[in-house]
Amino acid sequence: MTSTIPIRWRVVLVAWLLAGTLAFAQPSGEPLASAVDAVNMTVSDLDRAVNFYTRVLYFEKISDTEVAGESFEHLEGVFGLRMRVARLRLGDEYIELTEYLAPKGLPISRELRSNDRSFQHIAIIVSDMDKAYAWLRQNKVEYASSGPQRLPDWNKNAAGIRAFYFKDPDGHPLEVLAFPPDKGSQKWHRSSEELFLGIDHTAIVVADTDSSLKFYRDLLGMRVAGESENYGTEQEHLNNVFGAHLRITSLRSPSGPGVELLEYLAPRDGQPFPADERANDVLHRQTEIVTADARTAAQKLVSAHTKFVSSGLVTESDGQLGFRNALLVRDPDGHPVLIEEK
């Protein structure tokens, strides 16, 4: 049942952030990013999206909330908004699905390719790839790969991984992935009767890995957990991009799923992130990162000349939406990142 929550927020303008003092400083050496909380995807019809994720992919709906008000407008950069947000869980990980009741945004372009810089997916770990693929086919999902691919043995960092790209009803890319015994977190190898186990990471296409590392590693404090260079017919058919040659960098924070950077060394013809993308467009996906002190994070983001979507730091006085302070920014390629203090 949908509930409407009264909103009591205030907006702290970015200019104010520059006046922050050492009283808000985090302990020395503590990363800004303490966890990746969720990936939030804008959808055109929340009921349809929730049905897909719960019925086909076995997510559990945790909450369904309707919100509106000036402070949300400042946070998301959309005037006159009213949003309905559902939070879903799979294993230990979460996603959020947001339908903008007003104003409606643009749909995802059918021409979106896996090497376009607006590409982002979540990687869902499965216990049995053959069973997962058969189930997805039975449910007539839209293909993004030509079929499941097994990455070749010559690629030591990825050998034996099986993966398949497909799309949800709105066109959001998704991946199912199965690790061989020598790869992936131990949690993915525990005995389980479940077919869909949880979310290992979200992957984003970037123009330049080193520039992205300055944001995710050097600014937010995420650590590099793995690197790989993938190419060949298996990678081409997984991404459905002829000649695909990728530099892949996996990043982790202390908890939650990882963030994976996908740089296409070839081909280099991927489209840039749309400069006019807005949070109510169905293309919108925001990675939600938890920080211990959003004010300190905001100050550092301003100092690093990060592009803000929010007009400033938004504070929720009663904490009913799960965080006290939050702001929405863009990474070097334009991918939205929500920084939130619980």
Regions found by a protein language model. Give the residues of each.
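N-terminal secretory signal peptides that target proteins for export/translocation
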Residues: 1-8
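Short, charged/polar, Gly/Pro-enriched secondary-structure boundary elements
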Residues: 105-106, 172, 270, 335
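Bacterial N-terminal signal peptides
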Residues: 10-23
